[in-house]
A protein has these predicted regions:
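Basic, glycine/lysine-rich polyanion-binding surfaces/domains
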Residues: 1-175
Length: 175
């Protein structure tokens, strides 16, 4: 059962998050991801993302992240402290799939909404429960205006934990 009384609703500017564009043919990127990450990327569409991770040869998690498909682009949304780990590992496989990786200069906004709130067309569902859901939105033009319904980064992290997600910290990688 979800401890819903502790969930806080609103939006957060995820300043410590990086968006990485995996550039290539749709199927090439899909095949790359299917072979390297822990989620089923065939379930991803314009509004539904996946929480995923990348493991080393021993099966230990190197980093975790979200995968979304935004405006015909495969994006990896990852903590900035872990982006180099992801890039160092995935770069080994890029030439085999004719895919490149590019760090984008986009703002990433996280939303925690109750079930009655409508998801906007530019949002990507990443976590869902009976009471609430979490989405990500890419603000490539830096147009999002902060308002009174802003969440702290700590509230966003707590919401993720309440909903069953564990974010790997840099010191936990590969353990």
């Amino acid at each position: 059962m979800l401890n819903s009384e502790f969930i806080k609703y609103g939006a957060v500017n995820l300043e410590d998050v990086t968006a990485i564009h995996l550039n290539g043919d749709f199927d090439s990127v899909l095949n790359l991801l299917q072979g390297q990450v822990t989620s089923d990327c065939t379930l991803i569409n314009e509004q539904i993302g996946q929480i995923s991770s990348l493991c080393n040869e021993k099966g230990f998690i190197l980093c975790n992240f979200e995968i979304i498909f935004d405006q015909n682009k495969w994006l990896i949304i990852i903590e900035s402290t872990l982006k180099d780990i992801f890039l160092n590992e995935i770069t080994k496989f890029l030439p085999f799939y004719k895919v490149s990786a590019e760090i984008l200069n986009n703002k990433v906004i996280g939303f925690t909404k109750n079930k009655e709130q409508v998801m906007l067309p530019n949002e990507h569902l990443i976590l869902d429960s009976d009471i609430a859901y979490l989405t990500l939105s890419i603000d490539k033009n830096h147009e999002y205006q902060e308002d009174s319904h802003m969440l702290s980064k700590e509230s966003w992290a707590i919401n993720r934990k309440i909903m069953g997600d564990h974010q790997i910290e840099l010191q936990e990688t590969g353990k």
